[in-house]
């Protein structure tokens, strides 16, 4: 960390994924006073996606081998994943869609369901610290596709999800399953409607453009 802090301290301004990250860097020795918070990733999407339909299923993006919960998925909500998986484990409760490029992936996600953002649970304490400071790329992927999300209550963007009404903020996978099973079609469609504006912003580079403008203004 000292190497990076020394490098950052040569800058006039730093761009951080969250407010908590800036505070952590200050604790590590950062002296730069000017900073801008990223908040969200963008996608450049120039195609028509589906309007999500109500389905009680979860999508997950990531290297399955790094996430133990795949190995004993026993919930009523079907779990769908993309990419390769280790044949040494029993994934009978998980549906694998194979590898898809960005265009194919967004089209598939946009058909309906929920997007899951979750940690690998290898070190629960460090995981919470990481997600409190990190800006989740998975979250932006699901929102870009226009589907509601399931996120842990310690995620840096959890308040954003709750305030916008674009998904469920939960404390466990058990609660995630319960929320989806109790969700009605009307509830789901309302979340999809709430998501339209956020989806438009992400798919048209709003957050990156705002980041540049905020940076220039802060340096002026």
Q: Which sequence ranges carry the predicted segments?
A:
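Nucleotide-sugar donor phosphate/pyrophosphate-binding loop at the beta->alpha transition
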Residues: 1-6, 43-44
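A short, active-site helix/loop in glycosyltransferases that binds the activated sugar's phosphate group
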Residues: 4-5, 9-34
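Carbohydrate-associated surface elements
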Residues: 20, 40-41
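Alpha-helix capping/helix-boundary segments
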Residues: 20-22, 65-66, 156-157, 175
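Conserved catalytic-core segment of nucleotide-activated headgroup transferases in glycan assembly
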Residues: 41-110
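Nucleotide-sugar-dependent
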Residues: 103, 107-144, 151-159
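A short acidic/histidine/glycine-rich donor-binding loop in glycosyltransferase catalytic cores
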Residues: 164-170
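A charged, aromatic-enriched C-terminal amphipathic alpha-helix characteristic of glycosyltransferases
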Residues: 171-174, 178, 185-218
């Amino acid at each position: 960390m000292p190497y990076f802090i020394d490098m950052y301290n040569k800058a006039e301004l730093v761009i951080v994924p969250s407010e908590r990250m800036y505070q952590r860097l200050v604790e590590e020795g950062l002296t730069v006073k000017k900073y801008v918070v990223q908040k969200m990733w963008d996608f450049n999407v120039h195609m028509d996606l589906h309007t999500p339909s109500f389905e009680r299923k979860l999508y997950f993006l990531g290297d399955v081998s790094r996430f133990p919960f795949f190995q004993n998925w026993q919930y009523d909500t079907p779990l769908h994943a993309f990419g390769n998986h280790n044949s040494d484990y029993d994934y009978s409760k998980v549906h694998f869609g194979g590898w898809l490029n960005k265009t194919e992936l967004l089209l598939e996600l946009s058909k309906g369901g929920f997007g899951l953002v979750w940690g690998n649970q290898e070190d629960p304490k460090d995981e919470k610290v990481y997600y409190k400071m990190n800006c989740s790329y998975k979250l932006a992927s699901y929102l870009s596709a226009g589907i509601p999300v399931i996120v842990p209550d310690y995620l840096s963007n959890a308040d954003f999800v709750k305030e916008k009404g674009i998904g469920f903020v939960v404390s466990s996978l058990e609660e995630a399953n319960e929320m989806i099973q109790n969700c009605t079609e009307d509830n789901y469609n309302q979340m999809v409607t709430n998501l339209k504006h956020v989806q438009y912003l992400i798919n048209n580079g709003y957050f990156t453009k705002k980041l540049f403008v905020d940076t220039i203004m802060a340096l002026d």
